[in-house]
Amino acid sequence: MALSARNQFKGKVVSVRQGGVMSEVVLDIGGGHQIVSLISTSSAKRLRLRKGRPAVAVIKATEVIISSDDER
């Protein structure tokens, strides 16, 4: 997948805490660093985000986007 955003961090999902509407996703990007993002629970399910799965955090000026290769 190619994106125009330059700030992309590959990592592994450490945890996903799902709520009714929003979910907290923690991504380990190495070097002792983690990125935490709130995304919709429907997006977390669609991306199949769960502990140990690879994902990419895309940082934009106003938001953080989490992506995976497994969109349905």
Please annotate each region the language model reported.
Residues M1-R72:
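Non-catalytic connector elements of ABC transporters
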